[in-house]
Amino acid sequence: MRAPASSLHRPTVEWFAVTLLCVLLTLVSAVEGWLWRIDQTLYDGVLSAWTQPASDDVVIVSIDDASLASIGRWPWSRRVHAALIDLAREAGARAVVLDLILDAPSPDDPGADMALARAIHHQGRVVLPMTQATTGAMLSGEVRPLDVFADAAAAIGHSQVEFDPDGIARSVYLWEGFGAARHPQISLALLRLLEPEAADRFPPPPAGDDLDHQQWQRANWLRMPFSGPPEPTPTIPTRPS
C-alpha cells in the first residue's frame, strides 16, 4: 500500500518550519542584542574567575577624599604635581604617567607651569595624555598638552577607552588620532619607553591614502585583559611632601 502524499511531505514541512524559526530567532537576537549580552556576561564571568596578581612595580597615586582634605579642593596648583614627580624621581620610579590634560596655562600662577615642565624634563620618562576635541557633538581635532609640557615629556599617548552599550569599558584601540591613528594608547606609550621590544608586537598602522583626514581614526582594537578589581594594585593618596 502506498503512503499518502501528505504524510511524505510532513517531515520536510516540519524541518522547514524549524529552520525558519531558528533563522527568525537569530535575527531577533541580533537586532535586540540578546547574543551580545550573553557574550559579554560570559566574558565578564571568565575575567572575574581568572585572576592574576597585580604587578608589584606599579603604584597608583590617587586623588581621593584624603588627598582633597589634605591639599585642598580641586584643581590643585601644578606645583603640587611637580613636587610629586620630583618625589617619584627621587624614589627611583622608572617612569611616570601623569594622567592630566594639560592643554591650558595655569591662570593664577604661570610659574607653576614652568615648575611642572622642569619636573617632567628632569624625571626623563613622563608620559602625558591627549584626547579628542569636540565642537558641539562633532569630533573636531585633538586636545594635546601645551608645548611647554609636550616638549618636556618623553611620550604622549591617547587616553580613550571604548564603552560598550552597557556602560562598561572592556576594550581600547591601541592607536588613535584625528586624521590618522598616530598616537599610541597611553599604556602602550609607556611600554614603548620601558620595554620597546615588547611594544614592537603592537606596531602603528600603515598610513593609508584613503583615510578621511577630517575624521577621528582608530586601529588595532584590543580587549583589555584585566587582572582583577582595582584593589590589588598598590594605591596611595596624594602626598606632595
Where does each model-flagged region fall?
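Terminal and domain-flanking low-complexity segments
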Residues: 232-234
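Extracytoplasmic
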Residues: 239-241
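Non-transmembrane functional regions of envelope-associated proteins
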Residues: 2-223, 227-229
